[in-house]
UniProtKB/Swiss-Prot annotation:
<dbReference type="GO" id="GO:0001508">
    <property type="term" value="P:action potential"/>
</dbReference>
<dbReference type="GO" id="GO:0005267">
    <property type="term" value="F:potassium channel activity"/>
</dbReference>
<dbReference type="InterPro" id="IPR003968">
    <property type="entry name" value="K_chnl_volt-dep_Kv"/>
</dbReference>
<feature type="transmembrane region" description="Helical; Name=Segment S2">
    <location>
        <begin position="242"/>
        <end position="262"/>
    </location>
</feature>
<keyword id="KW-0813">Transport</keyword>
<dbReference type="GO" id="GO:0015459">
    <property type="term" value="F:potassium channel regulator activity"/>
</dbReference>
<feature type="topological domain" description="Cytoplasmic">
    <location>
        <begin position="263"/>
        <end position="279"/>
    </location>
</feature>
<keyword id="KW-0631">Potassium channel</keyword>
<feature type="topological domain" description="Cytoplasmic">
    <location>
        <begin position="431"/>
        <end position="503"/>
    </location>
</feature>
<feature type="topological domain" description="Extracellular">
    <location>
        <begin position="235"/>
        <end position="241"/>
    </location>
</feature>
<dbReference type="InterPro" id="IPR011333">
    <property type="entry name" value="SKP1/BTB/POZ_sf"/>
</dbReference>
<feature type="topological domain" description="Cytoplasmic">
    <location>
        <begin position="335"/>
        <end position="348"/>
    </location>
</feature>
<feature type="transmembrane region" description="Helical; Name=Segment S1">
    <location>
        <begin position="214"/>
        <end position="234"/>
    </location>
</feature>
<comment type="function">
    <text>Potassium channel subunit that does not form functional channels by itself. Modulates KCNB1 and KCNB2 channel activity by shifting the threshold for inactivation to more negative values and by slowing the rate of inactivation. Can down-regulate the channel activity of KCNB1, KCNB2, KCNC4 and KCND1, possibly by trapping them in intracellular membranes.</text>
</comment>
<dbReference type="Pfam" id="PF00520">
    <property type="entry name" value="Ion_trans"/>
</dbReference>
<keyword id="KW-0406">Ion transport</keyword>
<dbReference type="Pfam" id="PF02214">
    <property type="entry name" value="BTB_2"/>
</dbReference>
Amino acid sequence: MDLSPRNRPLLDSSSLDSGSLTSLDSSVFCSEGEGEPLALGDCLTVNVGGSRFVLSQQALSCFPHTRLGKLAVVVASYRRLGALAAAPSPLELCDDANPVDNEYFFDRSSQAFRYVLHYYRTGRLHVMEQLCALSFLQEIQYWGIDELSIDSCCRDRYFRRKELSETLDFKKDTDDQESQHESEQDFSQGPCPTVRQKLWDILEKPGSSTAARIFGVISIIFVAVSIVNMALMSAELSWLNLQLLEILEYVCISWFTGEFILRFLCVKDRCHFLRKVPNIIDLLAILPFYITLLVESLSGSHTTQELENVGRLVQVLRLLRALRMLKLGRHSTGLRSLGMTITQCYEEVGLLLLFLSVGISIFSTIEYFAEQSIPDTTFTSVPCAWWWATTSMTTVGYGDIRPDTTTGKIVAFMCILSGILVLALPIAIINDRFSACYFTLKLKEAAVRQREALKKLTKNIATDSYISVNLRDIYARSIMEMLRLKGRERASTRSSGGDDFWF
């Protein structure tokens, strides 16, 4: 499309509302200057996305670091010196120009430009409510306005949304790379490609078939039984059959081992497989059992002292069996969202620990010196006071160490109050991040189910077999599920004070 001035349709003042910001008869800058209106030659017309704005060059020159400020300087230089001016060409700052009518064209959003226009009028930049933070950032960067110029009333909302958008974009890119890597699993190389493909779908895609769903349920049952069995083995009750519990432990470990080996044999890139967090958790869940068997089998010919050391090692290894609980993360969106939230909020968590450490150090020292002179006091040292300050600031309050003096109780009250305030600071950020991660995973699961259904439909069409999948139903279900998730996300944000507070 030719955008040259001779072929571009120009809007005259009759086609615009005389009271609007885009009217040529009522310029926002060509008003009164020193008692008289500015001449038309002192103004320039800016056409942004088809909307025309008449701006004062003098007012634009007050913002020389912006694109329009630079354009005003260039236009003024060309008027004085003509083509011999040392300034750059106006076409370096705009998409097209009509020097005859002094009109300059920009292929940008006219809606976003109204906020830029308000910045030139008042020196205050406000954020669009209808536009995402990253898109608004692109617009103001194009016009040469720094995001630090955003007014204080919109600054918190803008940076909060920008951080959330950047986090979700980074997570989306990571998930896309993971999905691409998984989709590129080449099962054609190696033995039994069809069997490996079907087995991989059963192991890694619980919603792909009835067999996959049954396998997922059985896996969850084995995890739950293993955890309960581990707890019963430590109870040492007289009515429990320890031999039966040991047999049950062997059965659960055999299931976990077979599940891990099948996953390992199905994949092509086994180094990448071993680096993934879910597979590391699976490996840590079964290794302590085999290491314990190995240690116990090799401890027969050792001395008593060595046997005691081996016993301690075995006890530590048995504690690692609690990691089996993390295997539920394969089947729980909430657990995966919790892991993502902790990973993404490490700065907030670190800041929380720093605040707690400072408070514990201060209040424990004060409390120790306030209580040390009391007979039979429980504050025997500063480390003991650390334990008291920790339980008090986290509002646990075991009661094993407590103050007896009035001064100590006042300090305890201040410690508890400061703990409540410190713990409440990052909760809103972590809650928003958890909600965003949860609904992102839900949308991803919906997209995966839709993709699997489309693959099944494509395969049926290619083999001329009976088509049991309706494409329209797949699309309708996916859209309805996404709308439902988006509605829940908005309701969650509103209930946590998100949009209602910021808007």
